[in-house]
């Protein structure tokens, strides 16, 4: 059979055009919308996934959306502590954070992880600006404890975000920038705490009145009975999620709590998606199928 290079090229071009056209209704729907994206998991370790994520953020911005990135950096913090010969300890799933450890957390999150992502985004133009929860009073934290065997246990300078002042982020959005937020935050006395990036992202999405919260993780979405692959949930509402929370795997709880807080606080939809898939954010925002698990306000999930 004779090959037809021209026909093959046209066929490939037509396929690309159909992909672009599929995005049209979503471009119309989300033009001008704010999307808060929690960056974490393999997406912030694998070099190819890092590059793809940065491209996604630039694509969103140039397509008329306003992405806001919130990131943690657990693996990088652990690696730096080991490099410095400092002992790392976890209690009840939380990192024990001494003042010395907090210095490392601050250095790694804002000075390493945040700067790297800002640099990757800015390879495509002067879009990204790094900031932390300390800047312009963005986050205020309250110290928290861990629970071990039913008992409250001190874990040092670990906090929950209790208030958000989004003015500085809104200023950057209005200037056409992509804010990249490191999750460290002072308490009312100015003592800086390490705060969970998932819950910080949920709080920021609520405060910004975002259209979407997107949380990257290392699984396909929410499983009600992990590791049973058939228990993957693609869509549920806030009431359904709240009922499931006590039985979820510990690593998924803060992500789903962030989604719950966001939709309870007025964000129309929140998503947990597989960050191991390159360009998963674009697939979520601009395709009909979407990816991962979508959380909706109460009364709008699948029954």
From Swiss-Prot:
Reaction catalysis annotation: N-acetyl-L-glutamate + ATP = N-acetyl-L-glutamyl 5-phosphate + ADP
Record-listed substrate binding positions: 73-74, 95, 194
Annotated pathway: Amino-acid biosynthesis; L-arginine biosynthesis; N(2)-acetyl-L-ornithine from L-glutamate: step 2/4
Keyword Acetylation annotated: no
GO molecular function, one term: acetylglutamate kinase activity
A Gene Ontology cellular-component term: cytoplasm
EC number: 2.7.2.8
GO process annotations (BP): arginine biosynthetic process via ornithine; L-arginine biosynthetic process
Record flagged with keyword DNA-binding: no
Record's keyword terms, sorted: Amino-acid biosynthesis, Arginine biosynthesis, ATP-binding, Cytoplasm, Kinase, Nucleotide-binding, Transferase
Compartments reported by the entry: Cytoplasm
Pfam family, one: AA_kinase
Positions bearing the site annotation: Transition state stabilizer: 38, 255
Family matches, as HAMAP family: ArgB
Function: Catalyzes the ATP-dependent phosphorylation of N-acetyl-L-glutamate.
NCBIfam families: argB
Family: Belongs to the acetylglutamate kinase family. ArgB subfamily.
Listed name of the protein: Acetylglutamate kinase
UniProt organism field: Saccharopolyspora erythraea (strain ATCC 11635 / DSM 40517 / JCM 4748 / NBRC 13426 / NCIMB 8594 / NRRL 2338)
């Amino acid at each position: 059979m004779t090959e037809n290079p021209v026909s093959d090229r046209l066929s490939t071009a037509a396929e690309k055009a159909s992909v672009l056209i599929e995005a049209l209704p979503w471009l119309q729907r989300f033009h001008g919308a704010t999307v808060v994206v929690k960056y974490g998991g393999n997406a912030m370790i694998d070099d190819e996934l890092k590059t793809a994520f940065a491209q996604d953020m630039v694509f969103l911005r140039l397509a008329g959306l306003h992405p806001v990135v919130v990131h943690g950096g657990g693996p990088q913090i652990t690696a730096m502590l080991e490099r410095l010969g400092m002992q790392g300890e976890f209690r009840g799933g939380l990192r024990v954070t001494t003042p010395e450890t907090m210095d490392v957390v601050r250095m790694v999150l804002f000075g390493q992880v945040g700067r790297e992502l800002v640099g990757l985004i800015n390879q495509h133009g002067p879009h990204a600006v790094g900031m932390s929860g300390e800047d312009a009073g963005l986050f205020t934290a309250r110290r928290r404890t861990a629970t071990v065997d039913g008992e409250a246990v001190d874990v040092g300078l670990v906090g929950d975000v209790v208030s958000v002042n989004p003015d500085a982020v809104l200023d950057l959005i209005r200037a056409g920038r992509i804010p990249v937020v490191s999750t460290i935050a002072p308490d009312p006395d100015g003592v800086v705490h390490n705060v969970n990036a998932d819950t910080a992202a949920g709080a920021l999405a609520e405060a910004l009145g975002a259209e979407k919260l997107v949380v990257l993780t290392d699984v396909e979405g929410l499983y009600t009975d992990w590791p049973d692959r058939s228990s993957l949930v693609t869509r549920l509402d806030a009431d359904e999620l709240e009922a499931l929370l006590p039985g979820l795997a510990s690593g998924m709880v803060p992500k789903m709590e962030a989604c719950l807080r966001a939709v309870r606080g007025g964000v129309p939809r929140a998503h947990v998606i597989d960050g191991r898939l390159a360009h998963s954010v674009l697939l979520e925002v601009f395709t009909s199928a979407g990816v991962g698990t979508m959380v909706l306000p109460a009364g709008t999930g699948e029954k």
